[in-house]
UniProtKB/Swiss-Prot annotation:
Swiss-Prot/TrEMBL keywords: Chloroplast, mRNA processing, Plastid, RNA-binding, tRNA processing
Protein name: Maturase K
Organism from which the protein derives: Sorghum bicolor
Function: Usually encoded in the trnK tRNA gene intron. Probably assists in splicing its own and other chloroplast group II introns.
Domain of life: Eukaryota
Location (main, coarse): plastid
Location in or out of the cell: Plastid, Chloroplast
Family listed: Belongs to the intron maturase 2 family. MatK subfamily.
Pfam family, one: MatK_N
């Protein structure tokens, strides 16, 4: 613990960056706007036609920020006609979004400088940082076959927005910037709303993507820290299947308080954490802890994770957010797949001289299947089929041209095959393909006021078949039975293929986003 405190103080001395003056620079907001337009997910400014950037409004924003006692009066008298004027929807939305995007860029500057200028240290070695979704595929194919139990964790959202601000106090030693963030969140959510509400999360993610990602990633890094710290202290073996987590200065105080409440708990905890085959991976607000230990060990892990997170963040973590599964007896949801590790029995007849006998061989196989019921339900909600999977026409698309209708149906079908190309069985995909193809034919027939048979005879089935089965030439990662990895540019293959660009269409994981 003394080593941890010394390391934390050393890191704290490097974080004296003052970013508040940058908020008054016009180029920061211009850069935020350009980044939003050129990024993969553009920033939508309400009230601005064609997303045009208004430098006049930004200058007006900076002038008002320079006014004496502006922030104090804004907090004490929020109903006055100040920066965020509720009576003028355009100015209110514009200022809130452009300020949040600019603030998101400014607070990332000290973190980037710390990563670039951090000297080499030998006191606490850094762990391998696997920040790419592509590292999940080798983890699935290689590690899961040798593990027994899995803990599926849903990372909880913080109860109060103040917790998100407090998490930044360690890395950003700039009080005015933190006060500005508090004021902005106070305006945006009235400071009394819970971030756990779907409305607050949706608004933050939709209108303030950069700021929301920064706050959420900071929170997740702190949430993961105590897991890595305990795991590192419990064993001399390094945890290589995880990411790099950030330290915080108040952890030692939390541990001392926890030790007073539960004497002797820490020493017992360390013993139960000594599993050298513990693997960790995080994705899309969820995490997985897989190990080769016993069920008792996994239950201990669950209990300690709940208790430590409660005292670490000062809010209650629901135990049902951590589910225990035995890999050989149950399936688990992972990146939109239903995954499992079944045991396949293979009988081999062995002939030795005049005697023959049977050898019962058991082999584990990592199996990934496509969840049929959720995807059919998503297509039903998007009005492509009924609840039982019977294809129907989509009336809202009949006003489009024939090419647009074919393009929309074909894009959905190709994305489904593209994303679920890592599935072991393709029967569900062919069923979805049948639903979309017949729904497309019914939509076109309804548009031309014809029957499906007549329209298909005129259009030709060959065109639809070729349209739905064409594959783009993308970079893929294929695992063979000999544990060798092949990188190639190709289309459809009989082997299980993980395409490296599926992160761009990961909305397919959420069935509600298909429409």
């Amino acid at each position: 613990m003394e080593k941890f405190e010394g390391y934390s103080e050393k890191q704290k001395s490097r974080q004296h960056y003052f970013v508040y003056p940058l908020l008054f620079q016009e180029y920061i907001y211009a850069f935020a706007h350009d980044y939003g337009l050129n990024g993969s997910e553009p920033v939508e400014i309400f009230g601005c036609n064609n997303k045009k950037f208004s430098s006049i409004l930004v200058k007006r924003l900076i002038i008002r920020m320079y006014q004496q006692n502006f922030w104090i009066n804004s907090v004490n008298y929020p109903n006055q006609d100040r920066l965020f004027d509720h009576r003028n929807y355009f100015y209110s939305e514009f200022y809130s979004q452009i300020l949040s995007e600019g603030f998101g860029i400014v607070v990332e500057i000290p973190l980037s400088l710390g990563q670039l200028s951090c000297p080499e240290e030998k006191e606490i070695p850094k762990f391998q940082n696997l920040q790419s979704i592509h590292s999940i595929f080798p983890f699935l194919e290689d590690k899961f076959l040798h593990l027994h139990y899995l803990s599926h964790i849903e990372i909880p959202y913080p109860i109060h927005l103040e917790i998100l601000v407090q998490l930044l106090e360690y890395r950003i030693q700039d009080v005015p910037s933190l006060h500005l963030l508090r004021f902005f969140l106070h305006y945006y959510s009235n400071w009394n709303s819970l971030i756990t509400s779907m409305k607050s999360i949706f608004l933050l993610k939709k209108e303030n993507k950069r700021l929301f990602r920064f706050l959420y990633n900071s929170y997740v890094s702190e949430y993961e820290f105590f897991l890595l710290f305990l795991r590192k202290q419990s064993s001399c073996l390094r945890l290589t299947s995880s990411g790099t987590f950030l330290e915080r200065i108040i952890f030692s105080g939390k541990m001392e308080h926890f030790g007073v409440m539960y004497p002797g708990f820490f020493r017992k905890t360390i013993w139960f954490f000594m599993d050298p085959l513990m693997h960790y991976v995080r994705y899309q607000g969820k995490a997985i802890l897989a190990s080769k230990g016993t069920l008792l060990l996994k239950k201990k892990w669950k209990s300690y994770l709940v208790n430590f997170s409660q005292y670490f963040f000062s809010f209650w973590t629901q135990p049902q957010r951590i589910r225990l599964n035995q890999l050989t007896n149950s399936c688990f949801d992972f990146l939109g797949y239903l995954s499992s590790v079944p045991i396949n029995t293979l009988l081999v007849r062995n002939q030795m001289l005049e005697n023959s006998f049977l050898i019962d061989t058991r082999m584990k196989k990592f199996d990934t299947t496509v969840p049929a019921t959720p995807l059919v339900g998503s297509l039903s909600k998007a009005q492509f089929c009924t609840g039982s999977g019977h294809p129907i026409s989509k009336p809202v698309w009949t006003d489009l041209s024939d090419w647009d209708i074919l393009d929309r149906f074909g894009r959905i079908c190709r994305n489904l095959f593209h994303y679920y190309s890592g599935s072991s069985k393709k029967q569900t995909l062919y069923r979805l393909k049948y639903i979309l193809r017949l729904s497309c034919a019914r939509t076109l027939a309804r548009k031309h006021k014809s029957t499906v048979r007549t329209f298909m005879q005129r259009l030709g089935l060959v065109f639809l078949e070729e349209f739905f089965t064409e594959e783009e030439q993308v970079f893929s990662l294929m695992f063979t039975k000999t544990k060798t990895i092949h990188f190639s540019f190709h289309g459809s293959q009989s082997e299980r293929i993980w395409y490296l660009d599926i992160i761009r269409i990961n909305d397919l994981v959420n069935p509600l986003t298909l429409n």
